[in-house]
UniProtKB/Swiss-Prot annotation:
InterPro entries registered for this protein in UniProt: GBD_Hemicentin/VWA7 (IPR056475), HMCN1-like_VWA (IPR056861), VWA7 (IPR052577), VWA7_N (IPR056862), vWFA_dom_sf (IPR036465)
Compartments (UniProt record): Secreted
Signal peptide: 1-27
Domain VWFA intervals: 313-495
Residues bearing glycans: 54
The protein's name: von Willebrand factor A domain-containing protein 7
Species of origin: Rattus norvegicus
Highest taxon of the lineage: Eukaryota
Keyword Oxidoreductase on entry: no
Entry-linked Gene3D superfamilies: von Willebrand factor, type A domain (3.40.50.410)
């Protein structure tokens, strides 16, 4: 552990935990994947996660769990904090830290992205570079204010993005300035107080550094008592006598005075003041804890817990058709919602938030979001079936609205008896479900093969529900067809799906009537349930011991069978026998079979590409791989045993299996290599080039063994897809204001061959949005750039979240086989003067989060040039930036 040089008696309660943290081999490079370049360094990701764990443990210590033993600080002294450990101690062993770790991943990736995004990586204000310390503090306070406003509006994805940006700037202050060189070992007492001066800032004519010829520059600073920071690159140019940032990526470090002062890593090749790296990291960690504690004081414990998803529970999100024929369905939704509220209120599984979006042709919405179950119930009771009833309805528009306001890793339930009128949104909604990692289940009280139905103007096609099928497949959900008399019973899947279940992979993955399918049950699974629906005439389930159970309702030798029309569930008796189970179904057509279970062992994942040409080396996160671009699969296993039990062994995943979704054919098997300490559960693998050569959806399954040697299999809830092009969308570093005009930068690049593409953009709400790039012809490894201008009307309401969507569609021969690519960007509208501004520190105990003035980016012309070095030799870097599917916001 790193020593703390400040007496513990001088620190506040959050800082008392510091001795427990910061493993010496874990800030300053972007993420842990940077450590290949500088082993032993502490990264932005480390600092962010450790600070969040500190504040979370403090929260757990102050808020004892109802009906459970209190946590004691002494139990964690001398140990590295692990999310799985403290969650198990607080909530119990059956509750997963997966959502919390996913939220931390969102913040950490948003933090790291500041070093990669075109709009932020070279902006000195966002990194406290070039002696722009006052401007840097203004941007820092603005990002914290955005975090606060977005969290209060229940827009947690946006709040985590802005929190990551704020923490990056805060941590950079201690690595890029000379605060540590001045002998300071505590955070700057005025940095989060905007009405207090930073004091003793070096002026334009003050020399700050002397020349340093070598890589390591321990004595290159002048005898200063003034605060300064280094210049990076050529914008702005370094004045005579000033310090450089330093390191191999800094062009200014070769100009006198040579060298630099950054403490980003332990490597002199990157950090001339590498010897002060650990000291800078200690202070940056203290400052990060201080900032998170500030947010907790402003949001309250409940609001802060939702910001970081310090809960095993998910959100409850309904999309309701309110046309005249939907009376039974609406009542079923109300019954399930009431049951969930009553059963879970006050428990760890109480929903984090409640979302409701009605639709009724020709309209949809508005969206209703709340964290108060009573308010949600009141709103739900006001929903009634209205007049009308013509097929089809604006279902996908309502679903898109729900996706934009539902937290990641949530289930969304759509109740309807109509096909979609807005089927043209199918691809965009599919992409949004993957980006938000939300699972969509459609409960449809309409037989797709039935020609009759509710009122309609023309004959209905049996394929009219295919958009629902496509979205359910892309999101990992399902479409359940039922009838009015069964909807209340079938709707019980709402409560069951919200229990944090995992879906077990079937072998073969594509079900064939009359042929058995196999699924593996390991020792970490409980409450195994088989769900089947379709035109089923019979089924048989066989255990590893050879016991069988058929379609007879009631309790059988293996579990409890229930039937509601053509919807069947079989809940296995706990504990289920470990080993290989078989299912065989007799049905007309293709039955739908899903096996789910409860477990604490699961995984999160995202993709990444190596970044070598930015300010720092690292692995840049993507939500999906890009065709032709060398990509890493990055896995984070959740629910591993604590360090105290490692001697007894732990489950291990050895490889990942990739399959084509439509046919289930084998696409490849890749070995998973551990990264860092085993208790962190981090794994990585290189995706095979054959997978990245075409844009096809594929499933991801991890395979390994549990502690007893039984086969261990976990599958990603959603299929993955390979994007045909890399699409970047990035905005200004600040918030929007009413009456402003903000430029957004756009880039599209191809790595799989020449492509002609069309680009379309839209914005919600309907503000004015113009673009100077509507079509591009791309060669191999070429990019096209453009600019969008977003005009915010004077009448725009403060605290409004604006979502910009860009869609790239291939044109020309074979274009119909190439799926569209979408990018989503969320921005926040704030008033210049806000109610969130607090009083001066002399009248308040908390730091102030004041308004800031956004600085607009210069106009970007449409140009074309080389995207990078290609996909062979050195790993490509050059066009990645901005937002790819709301880039790096979530991990499943």
């Amino acid at each position: 552990m790193l020593p703390v040089e400040v007496p513990l008696s001088q620190l506040g309660p959050p800082v008392l935990l510091l001795q427990l943290l910061l493993p010496p081999t874990s800030a300053f490079f972007p993420n842990i994947w940077s450590l290949l370049a500088a082993p032993g360094s502490i990264t932005h990701q480390d600092l962010t996660e450790e600070a969040a764990l500190n504040v979370t443990l403090e929260l757990f210590l102050e808020q004892p769990p109802p009906g459970r033993p209190h946590l004691h600080l002494e139990d964690y002294r001398g140990r590295t904090l692990l999310a799985d450990d403290i969650f198990a101690a607080y909530f119990g062993s059956g509750f997963s830290s997966r959502r919390f770790r996913a939220a931390l991943g969102e913040v950490s990736r948003a933090n790291a992205a500041q070093d990669f995004l075109p709009a932020s990586k070279s902006n000195p204000d966002l990194h406290f570079d070039a002696e722009r310390l006052v401007q840097g503090r203004t941007r820092l306070e603005g990002a914290l204010r955005e975090t606060l406003v977005a969290a209060r509006a229940l827009e947690y994805t946006l709040a985590r993005q802005r929190l990551g940006a704020a923490l990056h700037a805060l941590q950079d202050f201690y690595s890029h300035s000379n605060w540590v060189e001045l002998g300071e070992r505590q955070p700057h007492p005025h940095l989060l107080w905007p009405r207090r001066e930073l004091w003793s800032l070096a002026q334009v004519g003050d020399p700050t550094c002397s020349d340093c010829e070598g890589l390591s520059c321990p004595g290159n600073m002048m005898n200063l008592t003034m605060l300064t920071s280094g210049y990076f690159g050529t914008n702005p140019p370094k004045p005579p006598g000033k310090c450089s940032h330093g390191g191999r990526f800094d062009q200014s470090s070769s100009q006198p005075p040579r060298g630099g002062i950054n403490k980003d890593s332990t490597s002199p090749s990157f950090s001339p003041h590498h010897r002060l790296h650990l000291q800078a990291a200690e202070v940056a960690l203290l400052a990060s804890i201080e900032a998170l504690s500030l947010l907790r004081s402003r949001l309250g414990t409940r609001g802060f817990s939702r910001l970081l998803d310090i809960t095993p529970a998910s959100s409850l999100s309904f999309v309701l058709d309110t046309t005249g024929s939907m009376g039974e369905e609406i009542n079923a939704a109300k019954i399930q919602a009431r049951r969930i509220v009553e059963q879970r209120q006050g428990s760890p599984m109480e929903p984090v938030s409640y979302i409701l979006v009605p639709f009724h042709d020709p309209g949809f919405g508005p969206v209703f979001t709340t964290s108060d179950p009573d308010s949600f119930w009141q709103k739900l009771t006001e929903i009634h079936a209205l007049g009308g009833g013509d097929e089809p309805e604006m279902c996908l528009s309502a679903l898109e609205l729900a996706l934009l306001h539902t937290p990641p890793l949530s289930d969304i339930f759509v109740f309807t008896d109509a096909s979609p009128k807005d089927a043209f949104l199918t691809n965009r909604v599919e992409s949004l479900t993957r980006e938000r990692r939300c699972r969509v289940t459609f409960l449809v009280t309409e037989d797709p093969s039935r020609a009759q139905g509710r009122g309609r103007r023309e004959a209905l096609s049996p394929s009219r529900f295919e958009p629902y099928e496509a979205i359910a497949l892309a999101s990992g959900g399902e479409v359940i067809f039922t009838k009015d008399q069964h909807i209340r019973d079938v709707a019980a899947v709402v409560g069951e799906s919200m229990a944090g279940l995992v879906t077990l992979p079937l072998e073969p993955p594509i079900f064939t009537p009359g042929e058995p399918c196999v699924f593996a049950v390991d020792s970490l699974l409980s409450k195994v349930t088989v769900r089947m629906h379709g035109d089923i005439s019979g089924f048989w389930i066989k255990s590893p011991a050879g016991l069988s159970q058929g379609p007879e309702e009631g309790i059988g030798p293996l579990g409890h069978t229930r039937r509601f029309g053509q919807f069947w569930t079989v809940t296995m008796t706990d504990p289920p026998q470990t080993g290989s189970w078989e299912i065989q179904v007799a049905a007309e057509g293709t039955p739908r079979v899903r096996v789910q279970a409860q477990t604490s062992l699961d995984f999160l994942f995202h993709f990444g590409i190596s970044a070598e040409d930015g300010p720092h080396p690292g692995l840049y996160p993507l939500t999906q791989p890009v065709a032709g671009l060398q990509t890493q699969l990055l896995v984070e296993v959740t629910g591993l045993v604590s360090r105290q039990k490692l001697g007894d062994g732990q489950p291990q995943f050895s490889h990942a299996v990739l399959r084509r979704v439509s046919e289930g054919t084998h696409l490849g098997r890749v070995s998973l290599e551990p990264v860092g300490p085993p208790e962190r559960g981090l794994l990585a693998a290189s995706l095979p080039p054959t997978l990245l050569s075409v844009s096809v959806p594929f499933s991801l399954e991890l395979v390994g063994q549990d502690v007893g040697g039984q086969c261990l299999r976990r599958s990603a809830p959603q299929p993955c897809s390979v994007a045909p092009v890399l699409l970047e969308l990035s905005g200004p570093p600040d918030f929007l204001t009413p009456g402003s005009k903000a430029p957004l930068s756009l880039r599209v690049a191809s790595f799989s061959g020449p492509q002609d593409v069309d680009l379309r953009s839209s914005v919600n709400p309907s503000f004015s949005l113009t673009s100077n790039l509507s079509r591009a012809r791309l060669g191999l490894n070429e990019s096209a750039w453009g600019c969008l201008w977003l005009e915010v009307p004077d009448s725009a309401a403060p605290d409004t979240v604006v979502t910009v969507t860009v869609t790239v569609t291939a044109v020309g021969q074979g274009a119909s086989q190439v799926p569209p690519t979408h990018a989503f960007l969320q921005l926040l509208v704030l008033a210049q003067s806000s109610k969130d501004q607090l009083e001066d520190p002399t009248h308040s105990a908390a730091p102030v989060l004041p308004p800031t003035t956004p600085a607009l980016l210069p106009s970007t012309l449409v140009t074309r040039g080389r995207a990078g070095r290609g996909t062979t030799g050195k790993t490509w870097w050059g066009t990645v930036g901005g937002v790819l599917f709301l880039l790096g916001c979530t991990s499943w």
